[in-house]
Design a protein with these regions (language model features):
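Glycine-centered loop/turn positions within well-structured domains
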Residues: 32, 87-90, 130
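Conserved short alpha-helix within the protein kinase catalytic core
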Residues: 143-165
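Conserved short submotifs of the Hanks-type protein kinase catalytic core
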Residues: 114-131
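ATP-binding glycine-rich phosphate-binding loop
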Residues: 4-41
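AlphaC helix of the protein kinase catalytic domain
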Residues: 132-145
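Conserved HxN/HPN-centered segment at the entrance to the catalytic loop
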Residues: 85-110
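ATP-binding glycine-rich loop module of kinase domains
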Residues: 32-81
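Short, solvent-exposed loop/turn segments that connect beta-strands within catalytic domains
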Residues: 41-48, 101-118
C-alpha cells in the first residue's frame, strides 16, 4: 500500500499537516471525498497545495451501473476545460483514473478505505479561504437593509424581499 498517487506529470500525497485530526480531510459531499493534498514534481523539489477529490468509479441510479469516470471525462471535464480562462473557476490539474496501490483509511465512508478498486481522483487547484457555505453565513447579514416605519420603529428587509428596482 502506498500513500502516494502517481499522476500525469506530478506525484500527489495527502497533506497530513492539515485538518482538525491532521489527516488532510476537508469535506465530504454528494460526489466526492475531499482532501488537501501536496503536488510534487516526479523528481522532487517544490511542493504546492492542491485539492484531491476522490470520486466513486461507479454509482447505481435506478438499478443501472453508471461509469462515473467516463461521465466525468466525457461531460464534466469538457465543461471545466471550456471555463479555464475564467479566473473564478477552479483549475483542474489532473484526472487520475487508476490510483495504483494508493490506499487511504477513511472512517467517513462505508468501506473504510479509499483505493483504486472504488475511486478515481480529480486534482484541483487549492484556494485558501472560506468555503462557500462559510462565506454565505458570514456575508448574509450584509444582504439586509433597515426600513424606517411609523412610530420610530424599524423593519429588517432581507435581500430576497428587495424590490426589482433595488
Amino acid at each position: 500500500m502506498s500513500s502516494e498517487i502517481i499522476g500525469t506529470k506530478f506525484k500527489y500525497t495527502v497533506d497530513t499537516s492539515y485538518g482538525i485530526n491532521q489527516d488532510g480531510f476537508i469535506a465530504i459531499g454528494t460526489e466526492s471525498i475531499v482532501y488537501r493534498g501536496l503536488k510534487t514534481a516526479d523528481k522532487g523539489g517544490l511542493q504546492f497545495s492542491c485539492v484531491l477529490k476522490f470520486k466513486p468509479k461507479y454509482v447505481y441510479v435506478n438499478g443501472t451501473k453508471i461509469d462515473r469516470v467516463k461521465v466525468f471525462k466525457d461531460e464534466e471535464l469538457k465543461i471545466f476545460e471550456d471555463l479555464q480562462e475564467c479566473r473564478s473557476i477552479v483549475r483542474i490539474y489532473d484526472v487520475i483514473e487508476s490510483l495504483g496501490d494508493f490506499s487511504l483509511p477513511c472512517d467517513k465512508i462505508k468501506s473504510g478505505v479509499i483505493n483504486a478498486s472504488g475511486y478515481f481522483c480529480v486534482v484541483e487547484e487549492y484556494i485558501d479561504g472560506w468555503s462557500l457555505e462559510e462565506y454565505c453565513r458570514q456575508e448574509r447579514w450584509k444582504l439586509r437593509k433597515i426600513e424606517q416605519l411609523e412610530n420610530n420603529l424599524s423593519k429588517v428587509v432581507d435581500y430576497h424581499e428587495y424590490t426589482e428596482d433595488e
